[in-house]
């Protein structure tokens, strides 16, 4: 319940621009957010490993 209310609160926007923060649209996670992909690290890893994000490959060196 608390997580759902925080997601709705983040979508609403705030009175001041500085208080807004990014959340993952898939899971709602506020931390470890990648702007380039518009998702959190966990969802990014899950989708990249299944090949659903074009251009992202697993690196090996």
Curated annotation (Swiss-Prot):
Cofactor binding: number and manner: Binds 1 zinc ion per subunit.
UniProt-listed GO biological process terms: translation
Pfam families, per database record: Ribosomal_S14
Alphabetically ordered keywords of this record: Metal-binding, Ribonucleoprotein, Ribosomal protein, RNA-binding, rRNA-binding, Zinc
GO CC terms in record: cytoplasm; small ribosomal subunit
Cofactor: Zn(2+)
Endpoints of the signal sequence: none
An example Gene Ontology molecular-function term: zinc ion binding
Species assigned in the record: Geobacter metallireducens (strain ATCC 53774 / DSM 7210 / GS-15)
Annotated family: Belongs to the universal ribosomal protein uS14 family. Zinc-binding uS14 subfamily.
Family annotation (SUPFAM superfamilies): Glucocorticoid receptor-like (DNA-binding domain) (SSF57716)
Domain of life: Bacteria
Oligomeric form and interacting partners: Part of the 30S ribosomal subunit. Contacts proteins S3 and S10.
Protein name: Small ribosomal subunit protein uS14
InterPro entries per UniProt: Ribosomal_uS14, Ribosomal_uS14_bact, Ribosomal_uS14_CS, Ribosomal_uS14_sf
Chain positions recorded as Zn(2+) binding sites: 24, 27, 40, 43
Annotated function: Binds 16S rRNA, required for the assembly of 30S particles and may also be responsible for determining the conformation of the 16S rRNA at the A site.
